[in-house]
Amino acid sequence: MKPFAAIPPVSVDTLVPAALGMAPQHPAAARVIAFFEALTPATLAQLEEIYTPQVYFKDPFNEVRGLQEVRRIFAHMYEALEQPRFVVTDCIAQGDQCFLTWNFEFRFKNFDRTSLQTIRGGSHLKFTAGGQVDFHRDYWDAAEELYEKLPLLGSLMRWLKERARR
């Protein structure tokens, strides 16, 4: 095993989101961050500027290929939730890919409409030579970040979690 000092450094551009007052240095990542932080139902029409027509997208609930399917997922988000918004908290980019960490904030439409909910997650994105996203994989814990917050199901999830710890 090499001593730590003998391992050559890796060139990685660490990006700070624009929300923190610093502009990212990776143009494709900067464009994606700006797009998602300003996402509205009206801007869904601009998804083709961000994604390729054959984009692969996966999150805990969906696994799809194609721009129209991705558009459908985001349109459903606006139908099901009140005031959904993404806040990018960090970004690491290297070459043709980046990893974003983010907070997804929203209110439920059908219950507990007063409480702001936050899901913390991350996205692995791969870009084409033209800077469009061709691969988008979201990582977040649906059990902890969503199911535990739902009435009835939340109680069951917390009980199961406690049982698993024993």
Where would I find each of the regions flagged by the language model?
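Short, contiguous strand/loop micro-motifs
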Residues: A30-R31, F61, L125
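A solvent-exposed, acidic/Ser-Thr-rich amphipathic alpha-helical stretch
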Residues: L44-C98
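A short alpha-helix capping/helix-coil boundary motif
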Residues: M22-Q25, P53, T101-W102
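Soluble or luminal CAZymes and related metallo-dependent hydrolases
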Residues: P27, E69, Q117
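A beta-strand edge to alpha-helix "cap/lid" segment located at domain peripheries
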Residues: K2-A18, E79-R85, I92-R166
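Short, low-complexity N-terminal intrinsically disordered segments enriched in polar/charged residues
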Residues: M1-A45, E49
